[in-house]
Swiss-Prot record:
Subcellular location: Nucleus
Low complexity: compositionally biased ranges: 157-167, 453-465
Record-given protein name: Meiosis initiator protein
Organism from which the protein derives: Homo sapiens
Regions of compositional bias (Polar residues) in chain numbering: 7-20, 182-191
Region (Basic motif): 62-75
């Protein structure tokens, strides 16, 4: 019985290769425990049932491990996808010191998707309105009006209701089916017109519908032709007045994907839809779409603009001259102030008259105005706004009407008129306006200036001009204004070509304070340079004597022979050796010293014995001198 149970237990044991190491140990331990607790009295069926239960538990545990591993992978996959979405958000992922949680990131992603969907809906609303020509023909985006019966039939199918209309790019505003035959006959007889690539041309005259067309539309729903100045409600058929056509009507322009541009009027399209469908709410939808278009115009990074040509020969009022020539594409000229399409251009009230460069060149007046005029009044310490213009910015000579000249005044009478802001300064002054110095003063390059003063070129001037240069510029200017007539003491200041306002803004005052501090720091150096007289010729140095030449030639050798000796100690030892040397031994060193002094322009004594043709004798070797010093001195020298 016991042997059979062991045999059965081993036969029911699971395979080793299908279990992990932990599972394998559990099975072995359970089998061993079962063998230890074997009771011969227990029935054979109970032991088999326990083994089968253990085997089922192990199988369930393996299945759970397999299920957990894909969940971890899936969780990691979701986290990585969420991080990729978070990188697409136009916000920072950190708020202060905390990071955004996964839930917050998901909420931001959903809000961003809703924002994008709203913009997509606004863009679709633009493409719902497609082009119908003034004569009543149909044309899609980038299509000619008469291209064949098949395409005309496809575009002339009516729409069932406003809710079922689809916004496709190549569709057109739908018209009733009853006018299909009349429109086909008219489009066949009409000559095709070339497409326009820009909407700068003036709109053509709108042709009123023919009498037979009016008659055909009396029985059913009739669609009045679009009028150029319609604003969301139907109007009777009428052509634009000649005055509007002369000024050039600004209509909404759209570009298709093939870069073909055509004239489009949003409100007129909704007019046709409202009459066609006999529904009360298309006008409200038109107002919503117009608001969307206005929002899209403000949020576009590069809004499409329309160039309005300025012609000085035409009779234009002052308001049109003040207007910015780069007008938005959505602004009709005849729309009232309360219209949602009205976008008032920025008004610049400094340009008037005809023949201005902004009119001749067709450029924006903001290019010709000084940025100093746009500064707030809080920056200015007084109400003279032209001071900021002259101090901060340089006006180029394109402007015929400029602020008071910040340049050279040839006579004191012109100085008095400088504060009155002359409207027509002479051209000789306006030709020299581009030189800028680092101290915020604008120097003139005119030839009339005889003595332009600057702090760097005042080395040869008198002491009075140096004192005036060291003073702050605004003090010099106050002195000049207090004494406008040219006095002998201020003649140099009258000829000065700089002009500085009496009161400057705070940035200029700070800059001048720094410059003044730099001048004060450099002030003690200037008098020293001035007090120095003409430099005398350089004094000759003393002659090099024989002992100095002896030390130069033998000091290193002595230090090599006695390593560790200091240079001063070596000099003392050489001095003792020099005292012991005879005149014959010293003579070569003295001769070499005199030659060295003559070569280097030093003072040399004119002795009768010394001559230029002194023979150079080889000195006694140094080691021999040292050996002789080591010997005891002769008795007559002791």
């Amino acid at each position: 019985m016991f042997g059979s149970s062991r045999y059965l237990g081993s036969s029911e044991q699971p395979r080793a290769n299908s279990l992990g190491p932990s599972d394998r140990t559990l099975v072995l331990c359970s089998l061993v425990e079962g063998e230890d607790k074997v009771n011969p009295s227990e029935p054979h069926g109970l032991r088999m049932e326990e083994k089968w239960l253990l085997k089922g538990k192990l199988r369930n545990q393996r299945n759970q491990n397999k299920l957990l591993s894909p969940n971890k992978k899936q969780r990691k996959n979701h986290t990585s996808k969420l991080q990729e979405l978070a990188l697409l958000l136009p916000i920072a992922l950190k708020t202060g010191t905390k990071k955004l949680t996964k839930k917050e990131i998901l909420v931001h992603v959903l809000q961003y998707i809703q924002y994008l969907q709203r913009n997509i809906d606004a863009a679709k609303a633009l493409f719902k309105c497609h082009i119908t020509t003034g004569e009543g023909g149909l044309a899609g985006l980038g299509q000619k009006p008469a291209w064949g019966p098949a395409r005309r039939r496809r575009h002339s199918t009516p729409s069932s209701s406003p809710s079922s209309q689809k916004s496709c790019l190549q569709g057109a505003c739908q018209k009733p089916r009853k006018k299909k035959l009349t429109q086909a006959s008219e489009s066949q007889t009409r000559t095709p017109k070339p497409r326009r690539s820009l909407a700068l041309n003036k709109p053509e005259k709108l042709v009123a519908p023919s009498p037979d067309q009016k008659g055909s539309g009396t029985g059913g729903t009739t669609t009045p032709p679009r009028c150029p100045d319609s604003c969301g409600h139907p109007r009777p058929a009428s052509s634009s007045p000649p005055g509007d056509r002369k000024g050039g009507q600004s209509q909404l322009t759209l570009l298709d994907l093939a870069e073909d541009t055509i004239h489009c009027d949003i409100s007129s399209c909704w007019c046709q839809g409202s009459v066609q469908d006999d529904a009360p709410f298309p006008a409200l939808l038109a107002q919503e779409d117009v608001a969307r278009i206005h929002f899209l115009n403000k949020t576009q990074p590069h809004p499409r603009q329309k160039l309005v040509f300025y012609d000085s020969s035409e009779d234009v009022d002052k308001g049109s001259l003040d207007a910015d020539p780069w007008l938005p594409a959505w602004t009709p000229e005849n729309s009232p102030q309360g219209s949602p399409l009205f976008l008032g251009p920025p008004q610049i009230d400094v340009w008037s008259g005809t023949g201005h460069p902004s009119e001749i060149l067709g450029l924006s007046p903001s290019l010709f105005s000084s940025p100093g005029k746009l500064l707030p009044d809080e920056i200015l310490e007084d109400d003279m706004e032209y001071l900021t213009q002259a101090a901060f910015f340089e006006e180029v000579c394109l402007d015929l009407e400029s602020s008071p000249s910040a340049y050279t005044q040839e006579a004191p009478q012109e100085k008095d008129t400088a504060s009155k802001a002359p409207k027509d300064p002479p051209e000789s002054h306006s030709l020299h306006r581009s030189s800028v110095s680092l101290d915020h003063c604008y120097l003139s390059l005119s030839g009339n200036s005889k003595a332009p003063s600057s702090s760097s070129s005042s080395s040869s001037s008198s002491s009075s001009s140096e004192d005036s240069d060291s003073e702050p510029l605004w003090k010099q200017r106050e002195d000049m204004q207090a004494n406008p007539v040219g006095t002998p003491g201020s003649s140099e200041e009258d000829e000065d070509t700089t002009w500085t306002p009496t009161r400057l803004a705070s940035p200029l005052l700070a800059a001048e304070k720094k410059a003044t501090k730099g001048q004060v720091a450099r002030a003690p150096v200037k008098p020293k340079e001035k007090k120095k007289g003409p430099c005398p010729p350089q004094m000759k140095k003393k002659c090099v004597n024989g002992f100095i030449m002896f030390c130069r030639m033998n000091r290193k050798q002595y230090i090599r022979s006695c390593p560790g000796t200091a240079s001063t100690a070596a000099t003392k030892e050489l001095a003792q050796l020099w005292r012991v040397m005879t005149q014959q031994e010293r003579r070569p060193y003295c001769t070499k010293a005199r030659r060295f002094s003559r070569q280097h322009n030093r003072i040399v004594k004119q002795d009768g014995s010394s001559s230029e043709a002194e023979d150079w004798e080889t000195p006694k070797p140094f080691y021999q001198l040292l050996a002789e010093k080591a010997l005891p001195l002769p008795p007559h020298l002791q």
